[in-house]
């Protein structure tokens, strides 16, 4: 389990997270949602170890991440950032295989693992292409393939591993949004855990087990999608009155932007 205990973060002298506590269990997808500037990405960076909290602590499978060496942390969780700028002319294959540096293992298997990761994100046949030649959505999927190479097994040495994804479907068409979300769900079904920053509330409702809703650096609601996505919380957090509906056959809430009033 990833556990954040009362963490606060200060950036440039301003406190941006105020006492955040959350548990992200293996076998489950935790989605962090909220308006722009609410602290979602900062929370993900804090639980990944990229940012050091000014107060509180984060543990992964019971170990304080502050006590882990970078290579140890790299074996326990993989991180997909919001965007990645690469200035050098790397091929897709070279980018994806960077994820294998933490894994070790037989070098002879690296090509197969990279090809499997590219196939999983629907980029089979792209390995020889230059990264800069790809569309934004294709680049995003290349980076996810790299993360999958790093954390290729959801469970290793008897411990769950985690994918930390910052807006993993923001640049994708609907088909590939579903592909990536189903891939994340399968990672959970196989024993790993996923924490994802999300903006699409309908995709979040379809795939997440737990929603953590943030506003102004604080958690305003948490729980199952049907408990968090309510008319009241939507208005309180996003500042617009909106009707949350439920599909009768599946008991999954969905939000129609057409119903919003400002």
UniProtKB/Swiss-Prot annotation:
Keywords: ATP-binding, Cell inner membrane, Cell membrane, Membrane, Nucleotide-binding, Translocase, Transport. GO terms for cellular component: plasma membrane. InterPro entries: AAA+_ATPase, ABC_transporter-like_ATP-bd, ABC_transporter-like_CS, P-loop_NTPase. CDD domains: ABC_Iron-Siderophores_B12_Hemin (cd03214). Its EC number is 7.6.2.-. ATP binds at residues 34-41. It comes from the Bacteria. The complex is composed of two ATP-binding proteins (HmuV), two transmembrane proteins (HmuU) and a solute-binding protein (HmuT). PANTHER family: HEMIN IMPORT ATP-BINDING PROTEIN HMUV (PTHR42794:SF1). Belongs to the ABC transporter superfamily. Heme (hemin) importer (TC 3.A.1.14.5) family. This is Hemin import ATP-binding protein HmuV. The gene is hmuV.
